[in-house]
Amino acid sequence: MGEVRPFTLRESTQLRPSPPPPRLNSGEYTHDYNEVKALGSLNSTARTPDQTALALFYSDNFLTLWERTLRGIANANIDNIGDSARLFALANMASADAIIGAWDAKKYYNYWRPITAIQEGNNDGNKDTVGDP
């Protein structure tokens, strides 16, 4: 997906994050790992009710959330089917470019996701991270 030609970006690498993710044995990684583990745990007592509500909101499929939002905008503000189609086309082109850019970064940095990191915390070479399989 990261090698697909974007619709509006010059190239898929244009939005690649910099600097790269922190090294697994760095203090920054250790801090972030432990924060995500504490806040992201299913029964976390470190997370506020507002943080839980926000996490549940964003746990929905991104594209489903995006389309639902576009539908709400179109229904509330657009009477013409052509203008509505244009809104959906442009917004989904932007969405596709974001996904292309994200996959480019995933492939380039080859870095694991938080869920995998936390499950494999005992195997990451960092003595200050404890896995939670």
Residue ranges and their predicted role:
Residues 1-133:
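Acidic/polar surface patches and capping/hinge elements
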